[in-house]
Structure formats: structure tokens, C-alpha cells
Amino acid sequence: MRVADFSFELPDSLIARHPLAERHGSRLLVLDGPSGALAHKQFTDLLDYLRPGDLMVFNNTRVIPARLFGQKASGGKLEVLVERVLDSHRVLAHVRASKAPKEGAVILIDGGGEAEMVARHDTLFELRFTEEVLPLLERVGHMPLPPYIDRPDDGADRERYQTVYAERAGAVAAPTAGLHFDQALLDKIAAKGVERAFVTLHVGAGTFQPVRVDKIEDHHMHKEWLEVSQDVVDAIEACRARGGRVVAVGTTSVRSLESAARDGVLKAFSGDTDIFIYPGRPFHVVDALVTNFHLPESTLLMLVSAFAGYPETMAAYAAAVEQGYRFFSYGDAMFITRNPAPRGPEDQA
């Protein structure tokens, strides 16, 4: 399978660079996986597609203000993007500077704070701060907006680039399908008899990295930490027993659940995952998916194609472009039911 199979033309004007006034104000493109039929709706119409007894699984990770600006004590400006918090004082981070800091180099953080570069791990730098990391980030850090939102972060992003149910700090990118849900909509979903459960996957900056190989089978995913608790496993078993569907909110929820069921049996799991879902890989847990529109040639578009079928997915994206849907993190959403017999690019005539 070629990466180029997942390319499509996207006008720059369709990239959403700011959130809408209301979280639930987005449009919703509904894709029926078994038939490929499309319906153009509003996000609040999601209620009509959920059934009593369904279980919605959300990712409760919390985005940290992971971008820092500063300079080396020896001179030279730099930018730090925290990838993973290792403990109360240490992180793994991307460092952008004219000259990479060497081991032992001291970094002075704008707004106050200091860190030492203690080791390098491939492209990541291990930094040790003189004070606790999370409070420092909250005080002087910037929200790590994706590279395609080519503007500085502002005060609104602190609220809007975060789900209303975010709880466990550690992500450096938002699980964006969840951004559409406000508390009023969550209450309506609960009132309909839809259950909810929460997994955690701390989204890393690697989610924005392009696929740099020609054949997708040669691509290696970055690692991210996740947790699927026994309570979630029990909730899914109860959902199955009552005939409900497992509805994943976001590709990170999909990757969490399918990572915990790699051998076909769902079990509680806590640790790193590098699961790569592309056409041809079976799904063991998820029946329906709420997701945003993803970048051309991205691993997330490949995941959606595996779930809905390649021709159905690409046709839906073509329709979304034609209808002027807003793309990416602050954009519109899809609701997709799983295609029981998905085809890949190689199955095209």
C-alpha cells in the first residue's frame, strides 16, 4: 500500500485556525460504513445516531502548555516542546535552536525557570528542571497548537484546545474529536441512556509527524502512553451483553482500545503503544467512531480508511471538501459506523 494512495487536495481556506463560538456548533458528516451512504448534519444531531445502551469511550487526557521559549545560558534563542513528562522534574522534549544544546547546557526559560540538558535520546532531549515541571508549564508555557494552525496561541486556546472532561495531564496535542462536546450535550447523551467510559492516552507531538516512507507497511509509529482500566473492560463487556455498541470518541480512543485487545481479547492495559492501524487490520472492540477530518497521507486517515473502507473514506473526504467542511483540530467532525467488509486501495479496480 502506498502513502500516496491517501493523498487528497485540500484548499487552504478549509483549514480551521480558530474554534467556533460554540463547541457543539460544528457540522457532522455521517458515514454509514456498511452502505457508504453520507448524510450532512450538525454536530448536535449526533444524538439521533446514538442508541440507548451504547457505550461512548472518551480519552480524558489533559493537554499541558508544553511549548516553552527561552535561551541557552551561553546565548542563542531556542524553543522547547515537551513530548513526555518523565517525573516531577524531568521531561523528554524536542528542542529547536540554531545549534542543539550539548549535555550539561543550561536553558533559561522566558518568564522564569531553568533546565539542564542531561542526555539525548535520538531526536529527543532529556531536560531536568530546577522546579516541578507541571506547575512551571502552567505558569509560563504556551498551548502546543498544531503546526497547521499557523498563529501564536492566545488565551482562548487554553480553554478551547482542551476537552471539558480533561483530567489527567500529559498530552501535548488534544484528542480533538472530544472538543465538540460541551456539558449540555454530554448531559443529553446521558439522558438518552448512553453510558460513558474514559481511557487515557497522552497524545504526543509525533501525531503531527509526516509519514516519510513510500510504503505504509514500512512506517513505524511513535510510542504513546495509555491506560485502559479494568472498569473500562467491564463496561465494554456489559455493553456487549446488552446489545449496545462501543462508540469511540476520537482515534486516540480507538488506538487505546485496540491496543488493549491486540490478541483479540480485551484486557486492562497500562503502558506504551505503537499500534499502527491501516487497511487490512481487523478491529476487535470499536463499532462506531466520532472523529475530525485528518491530514492527507496521515496515519489517522489510514486508520479511518481501515474502519470505514478506503473507497468510502476517500469519497466522504471528497464530499467534505466540496461542501466546505472545516478540517483538522478546530474543524468539523464525522460519525462513522464500522464497515464489516472494508476494502483497501489495492482492492480498487
From Swiss-Prot:
GO BP: queuosine biosynthetic process; tRNA wobble guanine modification
Pathway: tRNA modification; tRNA-queuosine biosynthesis
Alphabetically ordered keywords of this record: Cytoplasm, Queuosine biosynthesis, S-adenosyl-L-methionine, Transferase
Top EC group: transferase
Domain of life: Bacteria
The protein's Enzyme Commission number: 2.4.99.17
Reactions performed catalytically: 7-aminomethyl-7-carbaguanosine(34) in tRNA + S-adenosyl-L-methionine = epoxyqueuosine(34) in tRNA + adenine + L-methionine + 2 H(+)
UniProt entry tagged with the keyword Ribonucleoprotein: no
Protein family per UniProt: Belongs to the QueA family.
NCBIfam families named in the record: PRK00147.1, queA
Subunit organization: Monomer.
Functional description taken from the UniProt entry: Transfers and isomerizes the ribose moiety from AdoMet to the 7-aminomethyl group of 7-deazaguanine (preQ1-tRNA) to give epoxyqueuosine (oQ-tRNA).
Name of this protein: S-adenosylmethionine:tRNA ribosyltransferase-isomerase
Organism in which the protein naturally occurs: Pseudomonas putida (strain W619)
